[in-house]
Regions:
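Conserved alpha/beta-hydrolase
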Residues: 26-48
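Flexible "cap/lid" loop of the alpha/beta hydrolase fold
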Residues: 97-134, 174-181
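Short beta-strand/loop motif that positions the catalytic acidic residue
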Residues: 195, 201-203, 207
């Protein structure tokens, strides 16, 4: 039986942006799916037309949503997530319900103190208005260019924005921003779990939304666990690395990591 793979997107990208990855992993012998977040419409057009469908959902809501999906699978899956999806991957890996995880440019979990200016600039899109906690928040093309497409040509960034950008709930950004002041923050991860599957963390050297300093600080959170945790940095790549012209390099590194640890 093929090992299931669950792809988890982050804020401002639709689940269908994973389709090239789904196809590649199926060709590699896995059984991949890319479910939407709770409330998420099936298409980009529907998501743009009804932003309220996702408003108000927080990290715990989304993590529990994916945990329920995993519970219905025939065996423990590999989970691969980008940005907030990378945080969700760590949540699910920490629960011990996955075979392995790949967290691509993951937003900071509770305990990570690094806060580069560029990351704060992106988060402020939602945080500047407390009312956004209960609303869906959209990016302008200019904001997408800074947060996702800064390592791309202006033309490619604009193309990706038009193809994949959607409104997303503001609540997760507030939960991540204030995690270190909240004892029961939903971004708290069981980083000490000694029996979990292997975890790969990645960063893009030019990422404005989740700069490498955040991912390096995340790796340190796992220092007390004997379980496998690895870090890979992709040079000259920004936050768009899962959807831009170089996505296959990131996907292949993910596949190689799984094969290296005999998860096929």
């Amino acid at each position: 039986m093929a090992t299931p793979v669950v792809f988890i997107h982050g804020l401002w990208l639709h689940a269908t942006s994973w389709q090239p990855w789904v196809d590649l992993f199926r060709e590699a012998g896995y059984d991949p799916i890319a479910p939407e977040w709770p409330g998420g419409p099936d298409t980009v057009a529907q998501a743009r037309a009804d932003p309220g469908a996702v408003a108000g959902f927080g990290v715990k809501d989304v993590a529990d949503h994916y945990a329920a999906i995993i519970a219905g699978l025939p065996e423990k899956p590999v989970v691969i997530g980008h940005s907030f999806g990378g945080l969700l991957v760590q949540n699910l890996v920490g629960r011990g319900i996955t075979a392995a995880g790949v967290a691509i440019d993951p937003v900071p979990i509770k305990g990570v103190l690094a806060l580069p200016v560029s990351a704060l600039r992106v988060a402020s899109i939602a945080l500047r208005n407390p009312g956004n906690r209960s609303k869906a928040v959209s990016l302008t093309a200019e904001q997408f260019r800074y947060g996702f497409g800064n390592a791309l040509s202006a033309e490619e960034s604009a193309e990706l924005y038009e193809k994949w950008a959607i409104p997303s709930p503001g609540r997760p950004l507030f939960e991540a921003a204030f995690a270190n002041f909240a004892p029961n923050s939903p971004t708290k991860i069981d980083t000490a779990n000694a029996t979990r599957g292997p975890l790969l963390l990645t960063s893009g050297s030019q990422d404005h939304t989740v700069p490498p300093a955040i991912v390096k600080a995340t790796l340190k959170q796992y220092a007390k666990s004997p379980a496998i945790t690895e870090l890979r940095t992709f040079e000259d790549r920004g936050h768009s690395l899962t959807i831009d012209h170089g996505w296959q390099e990131v996907a292949q590194v993910s596949l190689d990591f799984l094969k290296q640890h005999s998860i096929t």
